[in-house]
Design a protein with these regions (language model features):
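Basic nucleic-acid-binding interfaces
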Residues: 1-135
Length: 135
């Protein structure tokens, strides 16, 4: 069994699978942009009690598996991340601006799933295999 997270009053193990899509599925995410987006996540996440477990991308979306604390307001974190990463990615990679719609990087919506329905290793493998070339 995996080690549980804990705080003063609880023990927990909360895994989430997040999918964030580029607005109108514009094809702008390459390896350097994904790596920078991941660095931004790793900078912001600790302030919200979030730990990154897996990160991968396809050309128009990213998959993230992370752990969080019960008190974490996930929607606030996700919106803060999307806002900061959008601003920084457009500044650091100005060439993507011409592919975006009205300067908007991320779609306003996102998909957030708990990892309780499938074993974490299955989700981990799924994320690791995202973006692989299909024959």
């Amino acid at each position: 069994m995996e080690n549980m997270d804990h705080n003063a009053h609880s023990v927990y193990l909360m895994y989430y699978h997040l999918i964030m899509v580029v607005k109108y599925r514009r094809k702008v995410i390459n390896d350097p942009i994904s790596e920078r987006a991941k660095e931004i996540w790793e900078y912001i996440a600790p302030r919200y009690g979030i730990v990154l477990e897996e990160w991968n991308h396809d050309i128009d979306h990213v998959h993230v598996m992370f752990r969080a604390q019960p008190k974490t307001e996930l929607s606030k974190f996700i919106n803060a991340y999307k806002s900061a990463s959008s601003r920084l990615l457009k500044k650091e990679y100005p060439e993507i601006r011409e592919k975006l719609w009205k300067e908007t990087f991320w779609s306003q919506s996102f998909c957030l799933l708990t990892a309780g329905g499938a074993p974490v290793e299955v989700i981990r493998q799924y994320i690791e295999n995202q973006g692989e070339k299909k024959n």
